[in-house]
């Protein structure tokens, strides 16, 4: 039997490599005559660690270098945390597969002296670390008395900063903590009523060349239908709002019978304005549900909030 070969482009961070190795193992397990290799590299978002993500102002912070490898023929696919993948992709590339989603929730991680608290009971002035404007806006809206501070670096670096006493607690994606073996550090899964998660959070997205039918067939073995439907609705919502991965837009999606329900939120960075609504529709047309919800939020002023945020970062 002829050996098939596939090369994956991946970020070099520990979490990215854990995720990419999982994809490699699953593909080789499902396709016995497939040989998968990995080309890892640092992206712009990995290199710039002294500036808040939103201030860098690039929608492809963690993806551009991987996409370049595919476009010049040095890689067949790229594995991304789907939440980092922009909704508009370069010409010639497409989102070929969405894997089964891990828990998409945000999680509270605390240092030892704060183990007696939940997020809702943290004392006024507690220092909360997050690099996400989405988390920041929602938490400021709910808990204006807390002190929020930007935190950069990979998951392990952030936990080290927390344990050294620089922060009282930090907010991270539950999925990343679980994949890295830090599930025991999850002190609280943050309820949707407090913080809606990022678009695509918890799922992996496999990007490939649009016309590469052989590769599309190979990666299709990892496609999870329900996860894909939810994430496509979420990505359609984000695309319609013309938001990027770093703006204060949150979502939560669920499927019951043949209906998909999508909740969405847009907030100002200071947490003073927050618009939330939901939309539902046939699970066969998830992108229509996302578009419908975006239109509902636009009618309530979401456009104005996002324009003010983009203007704010253009001025800096």
From Swiss-Prot:
Q: What class of enzyme is it?
A: transferase
Kindly state what the record says about how the cofactor is bound. Answer: Binds 1 dipyrromethane group covalently.
State the CDD domains in the record.
PBP2_HuPBGD_like
Is Cell cycle found in the keyword set?
no
Q: Which pathway or pathways does this protein act in?
A: Porphyrin-containing compound metabolism; protoporphyrin-IX biosynthesis; coproporphyrinogen-III from 5-aminolevulinate: step 2/4; Porphyrin-containing compound metabolism; chlorophyll biosynthesis
Q: Which GO terms describe its molecular function?
A: hydroxymethylbilane synthase activity
Entry's EC annotation: 2.5.1.61
Biological-process GO terms, alphabetical = chlorophyll biosynthetic process; protoporphyrinogen IX biosynthetic process
The protein's required cofactor(s) are namely: dipyrromethane
Tell me the PROSITE patterns matching this sequence.
Answer: PORPHOBILINOGEN_DEAM
Question: Which InterPro entries does the record associate with it?
Answer: HemC (IPR000860), Porphobilin_deaminase_cofac_BS (IPR022419), Porphobilin_deaminase_N (IPR022417), Porphobilinogen_deaminase_C (IPR022418), Porphobilinogen_deaminase_C_sf (IPR036803)
Q: Has the keyword Transferase been applied to this entry?
A: yes
Reactions catalysed, semicolon-separated, are: 4 porphobilinogen + H2O = hydroxymethylbilane + 4 NH4(+)
Report keywords, A-Z: Chlorophyll biosynthesis, Porphyrin biosynthesis, Transferase
The family line of this record is: Belongs to the HMBS family.
Q: Mention any additional remark.
A: The porphobilinogen subunits are added to the dipyrromethane group.
Q: How does it assemble?
A: Monomer.
Q: What is this protein called?
A: Porphobilinogen deaminase
- Gene behind this chain? hemC
